[in-house]
Design a protein with these regions (language model features):
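Accessory carbohydrate-recognition regions in carbohydrate-active enzymes
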Residues: 1-142
Length: 142
């Protein structure tokens, strides 16, 4: 089941679900999370819209007052990138909409190696993807 949501913490107990209330940065939005299990895992297929300088690991800053959430929907403004981001999901699909302040500087990080709690032995076994066109990416992740 898809649980599309932000990953604000990557290592340690506070990263168990990917999101921690005390955090003010978003590393990525990932498609799968465990909830209520007492242990962290998943955080599969990380996506982060960003702008500005290319970097290996862009990190978004956000303000709690600019978050909105309801079942199946999450929205937040990525302050340092000037991007309004909205997520929604069904059982098997996650959809992200990014509205960039600067329409000429649009970038999207797709990280198939992202995982929560790598220090607990969690790892990506393999992945592959291909760009079909300028709006479609298909692939596998395991």
């Amino acid at each position: 089941m898809v649980q599309f949501s932000p990953d604000t913490h990557l290592i340690g107990w506070d990263a168990s679900s990917g999101y921690h209330e005390s955090d003010s940065v978003i590393y990525a939005f990932s498609l799968t999370h465990l909830s209520g299990t007492g242990i962290g895992d998943l955080g599969d297929v990380a996506i982060l819209p960003y702008s500005g300088a290319d970097t290996l690991r862009p990190i978004a800053q956000f303000d709690k007052t600019e978050e909105a959430a309801s079942p199946g929907y999450y929205s937040v403004r990525l302050k340092n990138f000037g991007i309004q981001t909205e997520l929604t999901s069904t059982d098997r699909v996650g959809l992200l909409r990014a509205t960039y302040a600067d329409s000429t500087d649009r970038k999207l990080l797709l990280d198939l190696g992202h995982i929560l709690q790598p220090n607990w032995g969690h790892k990506v076994v393999g992945n592959d993807f291909r760009l079909v066109n300028d709006s479609t990416i298909v692939g596998t992740y395991y």
